[in-house]
Curated annotation (Swiss-Prot):
Gene name of this polypeptide: Slc31a1
Stated family: Belongs to the copper transporter (Ctr) (TC 1.A.56) family. SLC31A subfamily.
Protein's recorded name: High affinity copper uptake protein 1
Self-association state and partner proteins as the record states: Homotrimer; is stabilized by cisplatin via interactions between cisplatin and the methionine-rich clusters, and could be crucial for the copper(2+) reduction process and copper(1+) stabilization. Heterotrimer between SLC31A1, CCS and SOD1; this heterotrimer is copper(1+)-mediated and its maintenance is regulated through SOD1 activation. Interacts with KDR; this interaction is induced upon VEGFA stimulation leading to SLC31A1 and KDR subsequent co-internalization to early endosomes, thereby activating KDR downstream signaling in endothelial cells.
Sites bearing Cysteine sulfenic acid (-SOH), chain numbering: C186
Annotated compartments: Cell membrane; Early endosome membrane; Recycling endosome membrane; Apical cell membrane
Topology relative to the membrane: Multi-pass membrane protein
Topological domains annotated Cytoplasmic: 87-129, 175-187
Site residues by UniProt (Cleavage): M39, M40
Lineage, top ranks: Eukaryota, Metazoa, Chordata, Craniata, Vertebrata
Organism: Rattus norvegicus (Rat)
Chief place of localization: membrane
């Protein structure tokens, strides 16, 4: 069946090059002065008026609100770093159950040697794995929140993310165990 493209009228779509302006972004408040354009800043700025923080209902308008947001974001970034280290520790603890399996292998001159294999096992439906899964979901959500906060390009909030992550790393990662396998050829 052959279709005539001109008869389809582009399925009723308007394909003109009209200049469309977006309506102002309104937040659900009683104040008429609480509106701003939907355009996001594409450069870093230091301000505290009409700063959206993750949700349209979380708008920063005063220096006090910015200070509170700074502290909250700082603590969230610290918590994120602590969560990463805690997950590593839980993973190490859950993999302590090591089994050794031995099997006989022929040796020189007809002797029999025992070869030992180490097996570290964890079941998919075990409590440690389910806990790691839940903590991973929380970690992913927090990481995206921190990314979106940084993408506001508000200098104060960006500093809060970076300083909180740095402080969290400083506080939680200093006792991070570095395990080096001596049989590994590339260190």
């Amino acid at each position: 069946m052959r279709m005539n493209h001109m008869e389809m009228h582009h399925m009723g779509m308007n394909h003109t090059d009209d200049n469309i302006t977006m309506p102002p972004h309104q937040h659900p408040t009683t104040s008429a002065s609480h509106s701003h354009e939907m355009m996001m800043p594409m450069t870093f700025y230091f301000g505290f008026k009409n700063v959206d923080l993750l949700f349209s209902s979380l708008v920063i308008n005063t220096p006090g609100e910015m200070a509170g947001a700074f502290v909250a974001v700082f603590l969230l970034a610290m918590f994120y770093e602590g969560l990463k280290i805690a997950r590593e520790g839980l993973l190490r603890k859950s993999q302590v159950s090591i089994r050794y399996n031995s099997m006989p292998v022929p040796g020189p001159n007809g002797t029999i040697l025992m070869e030992t294999h180490k097996t570290v096992g964890q079941q998919m439906l075990s409590f440690p794995h389910l806990l790691q899964t839940v903590l991973h979901i929380i970690q992913v959500v927090i990481s995206y929140f921190l990314m979106l906060i940084f993408m506001t390009y508000n200098g104060y909030l960006c500093i809060a993310v970076a300083a909180g992550a740095g402080t969290g790393y400083f506080l939680f990662s200093w006792k991070k165990a570095v395990v080096v396998d001596i049989t590994e050829h590339c260190h």
